[in-house]
Amino acid sequence: ALTFVYEEMRLFQAALPAANISDAVLPEISRQLHLSALLPWFDAIWLIGVAALSFRMLAGLWQVHGLKKQAQPAPDSVQYRFKAALRRFGLTGKVQIRLHPAITGPFVVGAFRSVVYLPLSAVTSLSPEQLDAVLSHELEHIRRADYVWNLIQSLIETLFFYHPAVWWIGAKMREQRELCCDDAAIRSCDDPITYATALLSLEEQRRGVPSLSMTHNGQGKSELLARISRILGEKPDSRLKARPGA
């Protein structure tokens, strides 16, 4: 669209009699023509950026889809605690839990038929109370529809990748989502130390999780330490509870 506008401007300026163009206008016309010549390059850079980020997003979705092949049903003891957590959060839809041997961090996949993936090692490394806290974090993501918001945010970041403010705002939104779910986990177990030690235990096993999943373990050590400091030093912020898009 911008290329069309500048092309029309160029044709209009070319049609003006030379005598009617003052010396003061010529530099501006020259600048506009120079900019119009660069617009195709800007378009090409934008298309390349969108294509690269779209490929990354699709690769993440494909990676998430491939998790189903190796996923295992959770044992009855975990299923029992999971169903109890579902009732606490008022989630009556088709939400499932699966164990996976190749991941080390819990996360949520899916918008309408959500699946909570837990690392296989979490069943033995976490205490029942720690497991409840971790499940509460993931179920809060589902209750808030964070998986959908994350996809929308990723799409916006793909289209407007050239704007630093988009990435800054996106990082803040992801941070707020995790803090909201941390607060839900603390409220569920009523013991910040239990949840903090669960996070530390998961961090010790961490290898990485898909980028388009909803996870509280896919982050740097500094971010994790900041969250743990907040968990141990602050009470849950009730103002964050009702902000599903944050």
What positions do the PLM features span?
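Membrane-embedded and juxtamembrane structural elements of multi-pass membrane proteins
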Residues: 1-246
